[in-house]
């Protein structure tokens, strides 16, 4: 008799995706982040759902409703901090997942990669809107500064910003619509994840060597289910250490002050995971130029398949490209640090140099080094 999991119309989809899926036999721990991102999304949707039961999206009561959740709701503080720090874990996993894709040439799966870039944009938009909801000082001013960037668009900019605000400033209408979008977007993310996996399973997973592994596949279960469970336990451990020992480590103290349109905080900055893009935005004196650089800093990921000129897919056997990759990582860490610093000398200059270096490494240095390595192969 045939197994139910192989014949049942619904169960067989799950079976082909997570149980009998043929997987390369040599994928390393860097391939764990897909499942960890799925876990992060599940944690965020669940904790967010329970927070939404007690949160009110009104400028008068939003701040106090978050306080009420932390003080009066049973384990509300735990749910709130799991949600806030869960976002940080989400982005750590996202950055590592994208980094893995760049290092091992996974971007040659064109559709999977581009859906991934769209996912990155949507997750960033969701996180930004979520940061506005507690209605603290940094929520309000962050929303004001970032939405104001759209006014740099010629002709329609100002109208567009006022349309998004629902008035002439960030106010009740803005908060309500941000809450609505913040609630619905994670479900859109979940749908996009399905599409991401659909395209991935058309081709099969990449592996560290970058070589075709069709001749050497193993079933996903039990080998990689066990491996993923280890990753899950480590992620939950890290998240709970963060939540239970220093829940405000990655937050901004200014967000414990209720939003006040009449008082601007000395340093307006977003959450840590946006700082690299914020540094690129600030490094260009022109408003429109800054906005374009900000968008292109993420959109540039879509160019990687086109910029790939190497004879080899993965960087595993390309030491010069590896050097360039780690230069890029160091540069992104520098940008993250600069994004959190005040706009003064020497931070302005460092930020400008790091921004130029970011685009130069991706658009110029990596392809040149790859071509040089191709030449070395003929020696």
Curated annotation (Swiss-Prot):
A ubiquinone binds at residue 201. Heme b b562 binds at residues 83, 182. InterPro entries: Cyt_b/b6_C, Cyt_b/b6_C_sf, Cyt_b/b6_N, Cytb/b6-like_sf, Cytochrome_b, Cytochrome_b_C_euk/bac, Cytochrome_b_N_euk/bac, Di-haem_cyt_TM. SUPFAM superfamilies: a domain/subunit of cytochrome bc1 complex (Ubiquinol-cytochrome c reductase) (SSF81648), Transmembrane di-heme cytochromes (SSF81342). It is found in: Mitochondrion inner membrane. The chain crosses the membrane at residues 33-53, 77-98, 113-133, 178-198, 226-246, 288-308, 320-340, 347-367. Its cofactor is heme b. Heme 1 (or BL or b562) is low-potential and absorbs at about 562 nm, and heme 2 (or BH or b566) is high-potential and absorbs at about 566 nm. Component of the ubiquinol-cytochrome c reductase complex (complex III or cytochrome b-c1 complex) that is part of the mitochondrial respiratory chain. The b-c1 complex mediates electron transfer from ubiquinol to cytochrome c. Contributes to the generation of a proton gradient across the mitochondrial membrane that is then used for ATP synthesis. The cytochrome bc1 complex contains 11 subunits: 3 respiratory subunits (MT-CYB, CYC1 and UQCRFS1), 2 core proteins (UQCRC1 and UQCRC2) and 6 low-molecular weight proteins (UQCRH/QCR6, UQCRB/QCR7, UQCRQ/QCR8, UQCR10/QCR9, UQCR11/QCR10 and a cleavage product of UQCRFS1). This cytochrome bc1 complex then forms a dimer. This is Cytochrome b. It comes from Cynomys gunnisoni.
